[in-house]
Amino acid sequence: MSGIDPKRFGKVAVLFGGESAEREVSLTSGRLVLQGLRDAGVDAHPFDPAERPLSALKDEGFVRAFNALHGGYGENGQIQGALDFYGIRYTGSGVLGSALGLDKFRTKLVWQQTGVPTPPFETVMRGDDLAARATDIVAKLGLPLFVKPASEGSSVAVLKVKTADALPAALEEAATHDKIVIVEKSIEGGGEYTACIAGDLDLPLIKIVPAGEFYDYHAKYVADDTQYLIPCGLPAQQEAELKRIARRAFDVLGCTDWGRADFMLDAAGNAYFLEVNTAPGMTDHSLPPKAARAVGISYSELVVKVLSLTLND
């Protein structure tokens, strides 16, 4: 697809594993990315920061990194800052975009100030009176609701709450994962979609139809009964406009090069953006490979395209 000489990349580290709650997903993503790059002739090597110090990257002559870490320090700006310090080019967003992209609370604040539509929400802090906050939130937002830790990915500890009685326990569970919990009004009627972003590639939207209540961790990485609709079924003009808004949602956070923007449609077709992902999963269940495959781009071609974005000034 790209016609890039793989020798231009030099010695490439595929970063995967790490120590976040998403370690197992990252291990799967990283192994596939590693194989995809090697299939294209790239001099790629595995590197798990949970097992080796990052300083080894410089010591061992790596000049480039494909970041397949998910969550935690791999996605919150820390790895990005360290790679900047060592002068190693890397895939995905820089420090600011990565940090904001993993923080759903501050993402939503930026979107509110820049005109990107996002569901109404409330925040709960660890240590708050959960019963009192639950009563207040239901009065403001109604039901159903989604409860989310502010800084976990892969839908870790995300719960859908349909009754007021269930909300305090959901808040307590989410607060074990993060000191800030987001409670978001559930957008109903139009379905869930994702826009995959990879440089200048024009990738189709994907409509996600999980067998269960919503697109949770199990539906993302375990179940085989989630439906991924490509084409997504929307009129071409609407799809193009939604992709434009998705790119804006990505850009205003300082995110660059590649990732995902997830959103819901209500019954009237209005979009509400949920989150971005600056280091998307690359497993066989993951969305970017599916979107690429739908337009004739193989897994290996996709990872080379993503890596090629590190060649840009």
Curated annotation (Swiss-Prot):
It catalyses: 2 D-alanine + ATP = D-alanyl-D-alanine + ADP + phosphate + H(+). ATP binds at residues 138-193. Keywords: ATP-binding, Cell shape, Cell wall biogenesis/degradation, Cytoplasm, Ligase, Magnesium, Manganese, Metal-binding, Nucleotide-binding, Peptidoglycan synthesis. Mg(2+) 2 binds at E275, N277. It is an enzyme of class 6 (ligase). One of its GO terms (biological process) is cell wall organization. Residues 108-308 form the ATP-grasp domain. GO terms for cellular component: cytosol. GO terms for molecular function: ATP binding; D-alanine-D-alanine ligase activity; metal ion binding. It is found in: Cytoplasm. Binds 2 magnesium or manganese ions per subunit. Pathway: Cell wall biogenesis; peptidoglycan biosynthesis. SUPFAM superfamilies: Glutathione synthetase ATP-binding domain-like, PreATP-grasp domain. Its cofactor is Mg(2+); Mn(2+). Its EC number is 6.3.2.4. Mg(2+) 1 binds at D262, E275. It comes from the Bacteria. Its main location: cytoplasm. It holds the Pfam family Dala_Dala_lig_N. Belongs to the D-alanine--D-alanine ligase family. Cell wall formation. This is D-alanine--D-alanine ligase. It comes from Burkholderia cenocepacia (strain ATCC BAA-245 / DSM 16553 / LMG 16656 / NCTC 13227 / J2315 / CF5610) (Burkholderia cepacia (strain J2315)).
